[in-house]
């Protein structure tokens, strides 16, 4: 049988092969730029500081008319099936082939839409000040930067053009590892971040939220050794799908905080790139006037690789006049930092010159026309697209690729010039997370419909049945075996990190985000019923649908694993093996054959701890767990085994303690569920083959315990968030183990809560 010959990759056509009308359309795609030409009489000046925040917002009629006309066209999309609409606009996007081509053609690191957009900005404007080239040093700050595409794009630009300067950068983003941050507001892709964490600043509370004054103050300290800052970028936004017509107003406070941060940190002559949306609102007019008074040049630019139908634009500000020029106003702006700034207008109407308003209206009209044309054209093609139009679109997309490459003269970059040459670590968000996040609710419409349903409706419609079904056939722990070595405990780099006390655990790098979100909803909406699930579901029913590992079966598994563990001479252990069993006195009556010698470490509180929205983030639980662990470690000798109950392992703190166990035992696995009671501790860690814990590590954990004791008071505003470097928790097999452990625990809780809800519903119907 002959092998099928692989066809050569299709080579993009030269620009000369495209028709004049196609070339004209594509060149227009790359010409969406507007410049604020300033009057020669220097009329555009900042008003007296006393004028700022002196009155409420009052919209401009002409701009409001533009906003309303745009929203009228957007409203025509409300009856479209959004997943179909997204597929359609992906095809009609004239720049749709550029990203994949660039990735292959120039070997771009983290090549995303943002990478290409920033490359366009870099190649279209002199963002890097001459002072950076003269000094041989470039310093940049990147706000709301995750996953890091602007940084990767800038690296490619500098390295491929061989610019003669040493580059240092600092980045910010909502911290994807902070348990109180909401997944909906974050970019959870950490491919670059996990490998460059020393360059990311998440603030004194470790959340990464730039909309607090504490963050701004902390950032200034963090940047103190990196002066001057030549370039600041701010690419912030958040999900406005629930109210797309008000996107501009919803993100205005974020844009304000980004702009203030830039004006405070940027050096004289520096550049600032700010992502905004439509510029119709009073708050946007004020911000644009502020930027025009603070920089020599301001341009509004829509990259070709920014989807033409959306409102996104980039405000490119060149040659900063310096803090001295804006200092009096800046001081007042800092006092209004955060979400509160939306209450009062930065400037009243009368201080903004008519010449600026006219120019600004021109700008808004310019981009309004392009966006309106694109949406209208997409609607027309959605209703009917013939073969000829499809061919023309394909021609336009091919032409756009060539136009992009020719206009910006991108050059290849070898991998050894990438920021992350070889990724050794990566959060589960990038391995299991991305494979699972859309597994259960595939279409946008389904996800939006889920938001409108009550918890009871979701249960009744069987939305979570797949998890329950997986749980009943799943045998957790059997294939999750962690093999450890003491050499992994490189405690010299360990450091306690404190932060704002967690109100609840909303996200975790060690668990499927959709499962955690659903479990939280179940606890929140169904807590009263959930606590009495055992009264509604008989033990026989629970055992049939959800097998429980008894103490005997857990110890039998422990014995089996112990026999697999060779002693120092390579044979099975011949003498008795001490088994430290942490838990309730009820297990004292268990009769186990040799070689296990059971010793009880009594801790009723640990086994009876109830699950809440804090999960294992509750400082009281963490203190109790660490106390039991330290007490147990004092009694262990080489070769001993231990059974340790665990509530869950969603937090960095508990993941750190699991990492320690991983380092001082030959093997670790788990059993779940081990309890019939809902929302109680239902899993145990089986730790086999103790290998001695270094005294320095034990002392470190003792110090953590002592600090925990001091922070245990309910009124304490802070808690310990982590004590191991995040890099240590993001590598090896630990991530997979924690993912499996947390999935088993969460699905068990969900299963019993859902079972209780169903039985209650059936009982109500019978009545």
Swiss-Prot record:
<feature type="active site" description="Proton acceptor">
    <location>
        <position position="275"/>
    </location>
</feature>
<dbReference type="GO" id="GO:0005737">
    <property type="term" value="C:cytoplasm"/>
</dbReference>
<comment type="function">
    <text>S-adenosyl-L-methionine-dependent methyltransferase that mediates mRNA cap2 2'-O-ribose methylation to the 5'-cap structure of mRNAs. Methylates the ribose of the second nucleotide of a m(7)GpppG-capped mRNA and small nuclear RNA (snRNA) (cap0) to produce m(7)GpppRmpNm (cap2). Recognizes a guanosine cap on RNA independently of its N(7) methylation status. Display cap2 methylation on both cap0 and cap1. Displays a preference for cap1 RNAs.</text>
</comment>
<keyword id="KW-0539">Nucleus</keyword>
<feature type="binding site">
    <location>
        <position position="148"/>
    </location>
    <ligand>
        <name>S-adenosyl-L-methionine</name>
    </ligand>
</feature>
<dbReference type="GO" id="GO:0005634">
    <property type="term" value="C:nucleus"/>
</dbReference>
<dbReference type="GO" id="GO:0032259">
    <property type="term" value="P:methylation"/>
</dbReference>
<dbReference type="InterPro" id="IPR002877">
    <property type="entry name" value="RNA_MeTrfase_FtsJ_dom"/>
</dbReference>
<dbReference type="GO" id="GO:0006370">
    <property type="term" value="P:7-methylguanosine mRNA capping"/>
</dbReference>
<keyword id="KW-0949">S-adenosyl-L-methionine</keyword>
<dbReference type="InterPro" id="IPR029063">
    <property type="entry name" value="SAM-dependent_MTases_sf"/>
</dbReference>
<keyword id="KW-0506">mRNA capping</keyword>
<feature type="binding site">
    <location>
        <position position="167"/>
    </location>
    <ligand>
        <name>S-adenosyl-L-methionine</name>
    </ligand>
</feature>
<dbReference type="InterPro" id="IPR050851">
    <property type="entry name" value="mRNA_Cap_2O-Ribose_MeTrfase"/>
</dbReference>
<feature type="domain" description="Adrift-type SAM-dependent 2'-O-MTase">
    <location>
        <begin position="109"/>
        <end position="322"/>
    </location>
</feature>
<feature type="active site">
    <location>
        <position position="235"/>
    </location>
</feature>
<keyword id="KW-0507">mRNA processing</keyword>
<feature type="binding site">
    <location>
        <position position="235"/>
    </location>
    <ligand>
        <name>S-adenosyl-L-methionine</name>
    </ligand>
</feature>
<dbReference type="InterPro" id="IPR025807">
    <property type="entry name" value="Adrift-typ_MeTrfase"/>
</dbReference>
<keyword id="KW-0808">Transferase</keyword>
<feature type="active site">
    <location>
        <position position="117"/>
    </location>
</feature>
<keyword id="KW-0963">Cytoplasm</keyword>
<dbReference type="Pfam" id="PF01728">
    <property type="entry name" value="FtsJ"/>
</dbReference>
<protein>
    <recommendedName>
        <fullName>Cap-specific mRNA (nucleoside-2'-O-)-methyltransferase 2</fullName>
        <ecNumber>2.1.1.296</ecNumber>
    </recommendedName>
</protein>
<keyword id="KW-0489">Methyltransferase</keyword>
<dbReference type="GO" id="GO:0004483">
    <property type="term" value="F:mRNA (nucleoside-2'-O-)-methyltransferase activity"/>
</dbReference>
């Amino acid at each position: 049988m002959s092998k099928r010959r692989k066809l050569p990759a299709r080579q993009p056509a030269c620009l000369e092969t495209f028709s004049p009308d196609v070339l004209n359309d594509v060149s227009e795609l790359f010409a969406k730029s507007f410049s604020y030409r300033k009057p020669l009489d220097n009329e555009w000046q900042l008003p007296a500081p006393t004028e700022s925040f002196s009155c409420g917002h009052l919209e401009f009629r002409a701009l409001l008319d533009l906003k309303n006309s745009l929203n009228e066209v957007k409203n025509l999309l409300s009856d479209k099936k959004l997943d179909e609409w997204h597929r359609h606009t992906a095809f009609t996007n004239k720049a749709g082939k550029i990203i994949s081509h660039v990735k292959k053609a120039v070997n771009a690191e983290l090549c995303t839409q943002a990478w290409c957009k920033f490359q366009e900005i870099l190649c279209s404007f002199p963002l890097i000040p001459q002072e950076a080239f003269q000094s041989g040093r470039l310093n940049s700050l990147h706000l709301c930067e995750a996953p890091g595409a602007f940084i990767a794009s800038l690296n490619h630009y500098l390295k491929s053009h061989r610019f003669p300067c040493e580059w240092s950068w600092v980045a910010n983003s909502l911290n994807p590892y902070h348990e109180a941050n909401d997944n909906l507001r974050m970019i959870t892709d950490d491919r670059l971040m996990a490998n460059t964490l020393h360059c990311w600043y998440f603030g004194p509370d470790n959340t990464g939220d730039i909309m607090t004054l504490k963050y701004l103050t902390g950032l200034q300290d963090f940047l103190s050794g990196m002066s001057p800052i030549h370039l600041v970028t701010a690419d912030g936004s958040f999900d406005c799908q629930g109210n797309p017509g008000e996107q501009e107003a919803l993100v205005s406070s974020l844009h304000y905080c980004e702009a203030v941060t830039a004006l405070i940190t940027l050096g004289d002559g520096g550049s600032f790139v700010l992502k905004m949306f439509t510029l119709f609102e009073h708050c946007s007019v004020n911000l644009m006037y502020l930027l025009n008074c603070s920089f020599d040049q301001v341009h509004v630019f829509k990259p070709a690789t920014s989807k033409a139908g959306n409102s996104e634009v980039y405000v490119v500000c060149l040659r900063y006049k310096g803090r001295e020029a804006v200092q009096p106003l800046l001081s007042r702006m800092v006092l209004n930092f955060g979400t509160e700034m939306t209450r009062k207008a930065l400037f009243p109407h009368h201080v903004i010159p008519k010449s600026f308003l006219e120019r600004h209206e021109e700008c808004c009209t310019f981009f309004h026309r392009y966006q309106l044309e694109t949406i209208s054209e997409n609607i027309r093609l959605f209703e009917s697209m013939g073969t000829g139009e499809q061919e023309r679109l394909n021609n336009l997309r091919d032409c756009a690729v060539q136009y992009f490459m020719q206009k910006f003269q991108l050059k290849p970059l070898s991998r050894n010039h990438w920021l992350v040459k070889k990724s050794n670590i990566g959060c589960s968000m990038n391995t299991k997370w991305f494979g699972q996040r859309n597994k259960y609710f595939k279409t946008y419409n389904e996800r939006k419909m889920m938001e409108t349903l009550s918890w009871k409706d979701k249960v009744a419609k069987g939305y979570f049945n797949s998890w329950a079904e997986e749980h009943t056939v799943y045998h957790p722990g059997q294939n999750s075996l962690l093999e450890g070595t003491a050499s992994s405990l490189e405690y010299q780099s360990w450091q306690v990190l404190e932060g704002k006390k967690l109100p609840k655990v909303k996200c975790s790098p060690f668990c499927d985000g959709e499962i955690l979100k659903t479990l939280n909803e179940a606890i929140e909406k169904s807590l009263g019923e959930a606590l009495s699930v055992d009264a509604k579901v008989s033990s026989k029913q629970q055992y049939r649908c959800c097998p429980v590992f008894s103490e005997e079966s857990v110890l039998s598994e422990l014995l089996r694993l112990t026999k697999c563990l060779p002693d120092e001479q390579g044979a099975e252990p011949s003498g008795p093996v001490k088994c430290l069993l942490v838990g309730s006195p009820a297990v004292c009556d268990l009769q186990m054959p040799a070689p296990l010698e059971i010793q009880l470490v009594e801790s009723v509180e640990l086994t009876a701890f109830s699950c809440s929205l804090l999960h294992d983030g509750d400082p009281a639980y963490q203190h109790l767990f660490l106390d039991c662990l330290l007490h147990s470690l004092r009694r262990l000798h080489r070769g001993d085994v231990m059974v340790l109950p665990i509530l869950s392992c969603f937090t960095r703190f508990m993941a750190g303690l699991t990492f320690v166990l991983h380092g001082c035992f030959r093997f670790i696995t788990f059993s779940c569920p081990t309890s019939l009671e809902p929302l109680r501790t239902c899993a145990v860690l089986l730790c086999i083959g103790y290998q001695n814990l270094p005294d320095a590590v034990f002392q470190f954990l003792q110090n953590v315990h002592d600090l925990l004791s001091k922070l245990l008071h309910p009124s304490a505003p802070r808690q310990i968030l982590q004590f191991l470097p995040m890099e240590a928790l993001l590598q090896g097999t630990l991530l997979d183990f924690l993912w499996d452990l947390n999935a088993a625990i969460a699905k068990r809780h969900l299963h019993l809560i859902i079972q209780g809800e169903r039985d209650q519903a059936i009982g109500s119907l019978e009545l």
